[in-house]
């Protein structure tokens, strides 16, 4: 795998390829087999662990937890059929817009 910004796309491709494969041979396949609720739960758990690492642990722990969080986010995207390019396009659309202005522009629910 690449050591640059393409790593997320490459990892996403590997993750997506695990969908429907033997859950006894792949942690990713096991997550897919357990369903979206479990995938979302794991993402949430990793996000919390990342916050804890940022607040009370060292940089190495934060890096590790961040990698876990990104991995589980990619699994969630793959399960939902969201490709990274869609997220990158949304980020690009928001580039150059203040966060305050961008938030105001969203439709109220």
Swiss-Prot record:
Q: Which Pfam families match?
A: PRA-PH (PF01503)
Query: What is an annotated GO biological process for this record, any one?
Result: L-histidine biosynthetic process
Look up the record and name the pathway of this protein: Amino-acid biosynthesis; L-histidine biosynthesis; L-histidine from 5-phospho-alpha-D-ribose 1-diphosphate: step 2/9
Give GO MF terms, alphabetically.
Answer: ATP binding; phosphoribosyl-ATP diphosphatase activity
Its recorded reaction(s) are: 1-(5-phospho-beta-D-ribosyl)-ATP + H2O = 1-(5-phospho-beta-D-ribosyl)-5'-AMP + diphosphate + H(+)
* Classification via HAMAP family: HisE
Q: Which family does it belong to?
A: Belongs to the PRA-PH family.
This protein's name: Phosphoribosyl-ATP pyrophosphatase
Q: Which organism is it from?
A: Paramagnetospirillum magneticum (strain ATCC 700264 / AMB-1)
């Amino acid at each position: 795998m690449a050591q640059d910004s393409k790593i997320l796309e490459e990892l996403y491709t590997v993750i997506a390829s695990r969908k429907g494969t033997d859950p006894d041979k792949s942690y990713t396949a096991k997550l897919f087999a357990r369903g979206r609720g479990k995938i979302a739960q794991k993402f949430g758990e990793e996000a919390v662990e990342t916050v804890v690492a940022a607040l009370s642990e060292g940089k190495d722990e934060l890096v590790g937890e961040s990698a876990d969080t990104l991995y589980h986010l990619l699994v969630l995207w793959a399960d939902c059929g969201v490709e990274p390019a869609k997220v990158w396009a949304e980020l690009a659309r928001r580039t150059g817009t203040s966060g305050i202005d961008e938030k105001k522009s969203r439709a109220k629910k």
